[in-house]
Amino acid sequence: MNNNAFLNQVGGVSLALGMALTVGAITPLSAQAQELDPNATEVLQFMSDYLADTEAFSVNADVDFEIVANTGQKLQFSSYASMVMQRPTGLFIQRRGPLADAEIFFDGSQITLFGRRLNAYAEIPLSGTIDDAIRTMEAETGLPFPGADLMFADPFAVLSDGVESSTYLGTAYIDGVEVHHLAFREADVDWQLWVQTGDRPLPMKYVITTKWVTGAPEYSIRLRDWNTSPQIGANRFTFTPPAGATLLEALPPSELEDYQEAQ
């Protein structure tokens, strides 16, 4: 991607879009959203290639997810996540929220799910890659892992699968950083991605909207503290049970419940 040329175009697109929305001229945007926008595809591909070529990284995230109660009231819950990854076989995820306080370890030979509140853990033997670990965790627990798309060896293939239309919405700012704003539509969900401009196209925000569920609940991830050259300890991806920890066949769903709300 020629970033300088592209950014020169971005300013004009943003201004035109802002003027169109100001005067209520939404028809052109609606028409544009019915097809794949090459600018959105270009940014998504650039980001995906960058992540795929990054051998190791660490990142923290603030996660907000919504649920719609039986009364129709929409509630939002917040949690925190931290991840360290070293391709192709090292993954550590920590998640703390109103329900879950869990850690996930993968060292290329075994997945370990550790529930801190229960001081209990479950093991899943698996010889494979991070891609295999993500798919196995979803299959074994029955829970989706929103945002895991960004961890795959080929993020573009996973993210673009099922996309029916896309739109490049210009640039914005997240935490003072200029970002490209992309919007995508699939059959059951809409999702948006904010990607840092320049030569480090890191994802800064990811929002998934489940559009056919009453209230259209959203799952939002703000990614921060990116480190693409982390110092990783030799045992970072290997679980060592703490004193008194219990080995279970599987963790209760409540220990991972925060992962369940956005589908």
Predicted regions span which residues?
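A short, highly charged, low-complexity intrinsically disordered segment
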Residues: 249-263
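Sec/Tat signal peptide C-region and signal peptidase I cleavage site
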Residues: 26-33
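A short, polar/proline- and glycine-enriched secondary-structure boundary/capping micro-motif
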Residues: 70, 102-106, 115, 123-126, ...
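Bacterial N-terminal signal peptides
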Residues: 12-25
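Flexible, processing/modification-adjacent segments and terminal tails
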Residues: 34-43, 114-178, 241, 258-262
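Gly/Pro-enriched, hydrophobic low-complexity segments
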Residues: 35-38, 62, 112-113, 122, ...
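N-terminal mature ectodomain segment of secretory-pathway/periplasmic proteins
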Residues: 35-120
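N-terminal secretory signal peptides that target proteins for export/translocation
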Residues: 1-8
